[in-house]
């Protein structure tokens, strides 16, 4: 089993290029299966989750090639509607393949999704919405059997919660459904707008993708297209946290400042100076961070749940007491126990975490429970005295491309070991 060893207390400085957004690339790759032609997707990150999506695409009949950060998907010969459990279990968001298969073949048979175990993440919103659009869905033994013998049709759908995954599945299904679909209380994350941009480049008619009320006029067929995935705002915030805990001076290139606006106030309250350029963000951290007021995770444009763990690691060495409230997922404090093994003083009760900043952390052997927990441990390891070994590093590989190489380029002492 591979591990990562970090020797802490090295100040990070310099420039780092941001990868493409995992949370954009995955639904776009899935949507490519509904295109009767070739999709060329640029800035597609090299991640194990992306590899899992490519395996699924190939299994259902797509020809997929990767050259650097560009993935080409030829979905002309898509023919299989059944995705085996072992492929579905490799990524949590694999349920996003449900709507492309229904739209393209009129049927789909998939297992419940895999990936990070960070709570229930129910898919009932996905299923109830697709049923409204004409899908017949049965569940048995963890397998979803879906049919739409009369095709999918437009519908007015109101989500009880602005679920990103449900919004994506509805959006893909609606883009080729008969008639108009309106999604109310839709997710507003930048990744939703990016998926809509890809679908529009394929011929879809979509408006309001960043507004919470999305209108989609279905088209009969998608054509070949080319698209560039947006930068990963979550990894941007992770680099910011890494710079902050080391008193660093880091410029993050190839980013979009408007997408990280929700996290900037937290870093500024902690004493960092943050300057946003046209396509970069510069963070200059103080010698000692300050505690911040209550941080609440919320749907976009609120503070992102995916940034919570790394920022908590940052606040664990801030002067004073900070409070975090996790409003999106239950069971998303699985990194707390491991941070405490490094010397952090964190107490949790339900959704609330109270972080009492300590002078320093001390290196130890810790284990990543999920992707974001792993990034938090990496951030903490950079701040810790001595050596920190992170086990289960394969979970970090699901979302952070070239972590060691990128951090090493900024001055970190970090190595992967077998």
Regions found by a protein language model. Give the residues of each.
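Short, structured segments at the rim of ligand-binding sites
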Residues: 1-418
């Amino acid at each position: 089993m591979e591990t990562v060893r970090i020797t802490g207390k090295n100040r990070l400085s310099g420039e780092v290029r941001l990868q493409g957004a995992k949370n954009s690339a995955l639904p776009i790759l899935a949507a490519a299966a509904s295109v009767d032609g070739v999709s060329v997707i640029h800035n597609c990150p090299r991640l194990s989750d992306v590899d899992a999506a490519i395996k699924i695409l190939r299994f259902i009949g797509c020809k997929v090639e990767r050259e650097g950060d560009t993935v080409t998907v030829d979905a002309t010969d898509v023919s299989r509607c059944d995705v085996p459990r072992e492929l579905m279990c490799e990524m949590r968001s694999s349920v996003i393949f449900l709507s492309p298969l229904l739209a393209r073949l009129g049927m789909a048979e998939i297992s419940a999704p895999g990936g990070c175990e960070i709570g229930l993440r129910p898919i009932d919103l996905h299923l109830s919405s697709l049923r409204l659009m004409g899908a017949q869905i049965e569940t048995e033994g963890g397998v979803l059997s879906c049919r739409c013998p009369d095709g999918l049709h437009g519908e007015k759908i109101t989500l009880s919660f602005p679920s990103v995954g449900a919004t994506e599945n509805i959006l893909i299904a609606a883009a080729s459904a008969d008639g108009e679909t309106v999604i109310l209380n839709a997710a507003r994350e930048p990744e939703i707008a990016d998926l809509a941009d890809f679908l529009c480049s394929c011929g879809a008619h979509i408006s309001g993708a960043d507004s919470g009320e999305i209108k989609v006029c279905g088209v009969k067929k998608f054509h070949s297209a080319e698209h560039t995935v947006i930068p990963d705002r979550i990894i941007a915030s992770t680099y910011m946290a890494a710079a902050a805990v080391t008193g660093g001076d880091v410029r993050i290139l190839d980013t979009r400042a408007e997408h990280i606006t929700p996290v900037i106030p937290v870093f500024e309250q902690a004493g960092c100076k943050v300057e946003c350029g046209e396509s970069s963000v510069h963070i200059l951290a103080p010698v000692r961070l300050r505690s911040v007021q209550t941080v609440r995770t919320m749907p976009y444009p609120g503070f992102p749940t995916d940034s919570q763990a790394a920022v908590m690691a940052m606040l664990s060495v801030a002067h004073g007491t900070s409070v975090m409230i996790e409003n999106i997922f239950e069971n998303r404090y699985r990194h707390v126990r491991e941070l405490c093994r490094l010397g952090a003083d964190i107490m949790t009760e339900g959704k609330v975490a109270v972080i009492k900043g300590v002078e320093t952390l001390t290196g130890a052997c810790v284990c990543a429970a999920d992707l974001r927990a792993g990034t938090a441990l990496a951030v903490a390891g950079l701040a810790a005295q001595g050596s920190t070994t992170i086990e289960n590093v394969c979970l970090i590989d699901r979302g952070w491309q070239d972590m060691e190489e990128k951090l090493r380029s900024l001055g970190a002492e970090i190595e992967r070991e077998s």
